[in-house]
Curated annotation (Swiss-Prot):
GO terms for molecular function: ATP binding; ATP hydrolysis activity; DNA binding; DNA-binding transcription factor activity. Residues 481-500 bind DNA. NCBIfam families: PRK05022.1 (NF003451). Pfam families: GAF, Sigma54_activat. This is Anaerobic nitric oxide reductase transcription regulator NorR. It comes from Salmonella dublin (strain CT_02021853). Pathway: Nitrogen metabolism; nitric oxide reduction. PROSITE patterns: SIGMA54_INTERACT_1 (PS00675), SIGMA54_INTERACT_2 (PS00676), SIGMA54_INTERACT_3 (PS00688), SIGMA54_INTERACT_4 (PS50045). The gene is norR. GO terms for biological process: phosphorelay signal transduction system.
Length: 506
């Protein structure tokens, strides 16, 4: 068997038929799998010494979420270094990155593997991988035929990446015009909700607008901020992060605007604030809704006039900073109740973005699970970490109230449990390793705090009740004191004092 002109023409036609890049890539590898009669095919993008799957056929869905580092996958490293067709012998000692990831063949090792590096000029931009359970599957195809396939795929991938670069406005005025692949932001997901969010990020990134990023706790608002900064002309300058909820009122102004020597007790030298550090760059203010009204007024002045004043200094400093703010609160409601300034809200929300909760992202759960499995594999020095079909279904059926952060913790916990019950360096995650309805769900049954131990008097009963209420609020809000205070409808400072009196904190 060999490639006919008709087969090669068919591959080229498929690359033109797709509506978008993703569709074209999927058509390409599906066609290749059929033509080569192999068990699995994948198109990978190369960036920062790792391969990122763009399209797969015949592989488990979570492969799309995995990131294959060269250091962790010697076969892919060999493909990256070769510069030509790579054929791995059936008895190769090098582990295949897809071992255990071919549906229906989870317990078997891949036998035949061919790798085709893809180039744009002299730059490695990706690879095609072809795998089969039959050892001699690819022997009937010559290297020259496989090079033709690689050339077609490389052309399609190069064009797609160049268009992506131009659409994201990464080809800045005054740049050399040299092709430079856009760096990945780890925003993994192909669901309609995530696709829409990525489009909105591309639209706003190239502008200089302030952006308000909303979404539940654990959805990945910081990743959105990083993606906006990375796609902006300010990307060559710093992205400075500040968690407003972690700021004590006494030092919040100094953290934002800096201070001069002697401004207050302990100010032994001049110190720049976050705005100065972010000059000509971007400042990301996480949990912006936790700022006091007094600080909100000072922040508004910076957004209006671009001037800051260090604590203890009469002089003003000019700064050029783009502000990205994030919150899990409904700031419109906060404005109505007087807890957030309406003028600041309107300044920040010129282009609002909303990060969807994980329960609305469908199969993205499996992609993210694959990403976290690969992270655990590298961190723990394991040869492979894979999800069983039952585990995938289990993850898809769960509601994920803690969103992506909860999924990450659940995967890490499951790997540790599975590793403890299985000898060797290969881990297969089963549904029972998660036990999500009981063990991982962050909100305990509502009646749990009612089953209190018998107490001698009213005061002791009241204190026990308060302790349990605070513990539950903290558990439900990822130990975020500000969010827990809101849930309990009390002031965060009062909550800290009460917790200290009840012995819940030092």
């Amino acid at each position: 068997m060999s490639f006919s002109v008709e087969v090669l023409a068919g591959i080229a036609i498929e690359l033109q038929r797709g509506i978008g890049h993703q569709d074209r890539f999927q058509r390409l590898i599906t066609t290749l799998r059929q033509v080569l009669a192999c068990d699995a095919s994948a198109l990978l993008r190369y960036e920062s010494r790792q391969f990122i799957p763009l399209a797969i056929d015949g592989l488990a869905q979570d492969v799309l979420g995995r990131r294959f580092t060269l250091e962790g996958h010697p076969r892919l490293e060999a493909i990256a270094r070769a510069g030509d067709v790579v054929r791995f012998p059936a008895d190769s000692d090098l582990p295949d990155p897809y071992d255990g990831l071919i549906p229906g063949q989870e317990s078997l090792k891949v036998h035949a593997c061919v790798g085709l590096p893809l180039f744009a000029g002299q730059n490695l931009i990706g690879a095609l991988t072809l795998d089969a359970m039959t050892p001699e599957q690819f022997e009937v195809f010559s290297d020259e035929e496989l090079r033709l396939v690689a050339a077609l795929a490389a052309g399609a991938l190069s064009n797609a990446l160049l268009i992506e670069q131009l659409e994201s406005q990464n080809m800045l005025p005054g740049s050399s015009g040299v092709f430079e692949p856009i760096k990945e932001t780890h925003m993994i997901g192909l669901s309609p909700a995530m696709t829409q969010l990525k489009k909105e990020i591309e639209i706003v990134a190239g502008s200089d607008l302030n952006v308000l990023i909303g979404g539940e706790t654990g959805t990945g608002k910081e990743l959105v901020a990083k993606a906006i900064h990375q796609g902006s002309p300010r990307a060559v300058n710093p992205l400075v992060y500040l968690n407003c909820a972690a700021l004590p009122e006494s030092v919040a102004e100094s953290e934002l605007f800096g201070h001069v020597k002697g401004a207050f007790t302990g100010a032994i030298s001049n110190r720049s604030g976050k705005f100065e550090m972010a000059d000509n760059g971007t400042l990301f203010l996480d949990e912006i809704g936790e700022l006091s009204l007094a600080l909100q007024a000072k922040l508004l002045r910076v957004l209006q006039y671009g001037d800051i004043q260090r604590v203890g200094d009469d002089r003003s400093l000019r700064v050029d900073v783009r502000v990205l703010a994030a919150t899990n609160r409904d700031l419109r409601e906060e404005v109505l109740t007087g807890r957030f300034r309406a003028d600041l809200f309107h300044r920040l929300s010129v282009f609002p973005l909303f990060v969807p909760p994980l329960r609305e992202r469908g199969d993205d759960v499996v992609l993210l699970a694959g990403y976290f499995c690969e992270q655990c594999r590298l961190r723990l020095g394991l040869s492979r970490v894979v999800l069983s079909p039952d585990a995938r279904r289990h993850l898809l059926n769960y509601g994920w109230p803690g969103n992506v952060r909860e999924l990450e913790h659940a995967i890490h916990r499951a790997v540790v449990l599975a590793r403890a019950t299985r000898a060797g360096d290969e881990v297969i995650l089963e549904a029972q390793h998660f036990a999500l309805p009981e063990d991982v769900l962050p909100a305990p049954p509502a009646e749990s705090f009612l089953a209190l131990p018998t107490c001698r008097n009213l005061r002791e009963s009241t204190e026990n009740f308060q302790r349990e209420m605070i513990r539950q609020a903290l558990a439900q809000n990822n130990h975020n004191w500000a969010a827990s205070a809101r849930a309990l409808e009390t002031d965060v400072a009062n909550l800290h004092r009460l917790a200290k009196r009840l012995g819940l904190k030092d």
